[in-house]
Design a protein with these regions (language model features):
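Alpha-helical membrane segments of multi-pass proteins
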Residues: 1-139
Length: 139
């Protein structure tokens, strides 16, 4: 159980690897859904590859069903944007926009058109992040 709990935490935190700066480290339900979408099948794989550690067939069947249900519900949650209203939308979009800035700044782009596009992306995403943060402060 500790292994699974730590794995979920690590997967959630890893979702933030793509943010441009720590100012966009904003917890949100969409990243949690994505962590669950990764965690559930990995938990199944772990149980399948370590069968000697999981010797209770009834418990194993229950866990497989639980992990499958978590995968299904988290997948539906992210696709349907369950529990995402104004605040969660903004909290999800800020790290998303931050990732676009990071990619534009760090990618080895050589094409002049793509470089120009990245300049526009950086400017627009920074402006939109500032706007979203301001809206969040008012709500």
């Amino acid at each position: 159980a500790i292994n699974l709990g730590l794995s979920l935490i690590i997967m959630y935190v890893a979702m933030f690897a793509m943010i441009w700066s720590w100012g966009e480290f904003i917890q949100n339900v969409n990243f949690f859904y994505m962590a669950l979408v990764m965690w559930a099948p990995m938990s199944i794989v772990m149980m399948l590859t370590m069968r000697s550690m999981y010797r209770n067939p009834k418990l194993n069947a229950t866990l497989y069903a639980l992990f499958g249900l978590v995968l299904l519900l988290s997948f539906v949650g992210i696709r349907q944007q369950s529990l995402v209203g104004d605040r969660q939308f903004l909290r999800s979009m800020i790290p998303h926009h931050s990732g676009a800035i990071l990619m534009c700044e760090q990618a080895a782009i050589t094409d002049p058109e793509v470089k120009k596009l990245c300049g526009e992306i950086i400017a627009s995403q920074k402006a939109e992040i500032a706007q979203m943060k301001a809206i969040l402060e008012r709500k």
